[in-house]
């Protein structure tokens, strides 16, 4: 399931993040890439152990915790601490698939995270740069994503994807992975659609007798499928 989620960050949070990231020291993004990805990757990345990276990561995690849509769609069990990258001057990242498992370096690499869901949080105004589209190959074909600053897109970690060359300006984003309670994307999509339908029915017809039954179906499916 490819899903844009708007306004994960507020304007105040965006301003705070931009101020901190503008003052950061960036490194060659290939340092953190796997062998195959390093051949396609050309960008700058904020070192994971830098104080600014940790502060910015905490801010993003706090924003995610307030997004009911993110929780409903991803059903997170673990979230890899958000990372930050920057593209400019024609930089790009060719087609690749994310590693199946990431090891959280902030915990000494001892805490593996299965990358069921990939996520990109856009931090630059789309009018401030040319190119930089996130191109994702999914079951419905090729999807090109370029969202307003503060908006998030999530998609299956199994997806082949790339970042197009940035030919003008600078594209800054946060990216991270989620280990979901449901590793199966089709099951996540089904429960998300059911949850959205229950919420709409609650708004349109409060007290409808089917709400209790539908909510029970949701939780019984989650109970059957969840890995917790």
From Swiss-Prot:
Listed name of the protein: PKHD-type hydroxylase XCC2773
Alphabetical UniProt keywords: Dioxygenase, Iron, Metal-binding, Oxidoreductase, Vitamin C
Superkingdom field: Bacteria
Protein EC: 1.14.11.-
One Pfam family matching this protein: PKHD_C
Keyword Nucleotide-binding: no
Organism name: Xanthomonas campestris pv. campestris (strain ATCC 33913 / DSM 3586 / NCPPB 528 / LMG 568 / P 25)
GO molecular function per UniProt: 2-oxoglutarate-dependent dioxygenase activity; iron ion binding; L-ascorbic acid binding
Enzyme class: oxidoreductase
Binding site for 2-oxoglutarate: 171
GO BP field: DNA damage response; intracellular iron ion homeostasis
Domain Fe2OG dioxygenase, chain residue ranges per copy: 78-180
UniProt keyword Mitochondrion, yes or no: no
Binding-site residues for Fe cation, renumbered to this chain: 96, 98, 161
Manner of cofactor binding, per the entry note: Binds 1 Fe(2+) ion per subunit.
Gene3D superfamilies given in the database record: q2cbj1_9rhob like domain, Rabenosyn, Rab binding domain
Cofactor: Fe(2+); L-ascorbate
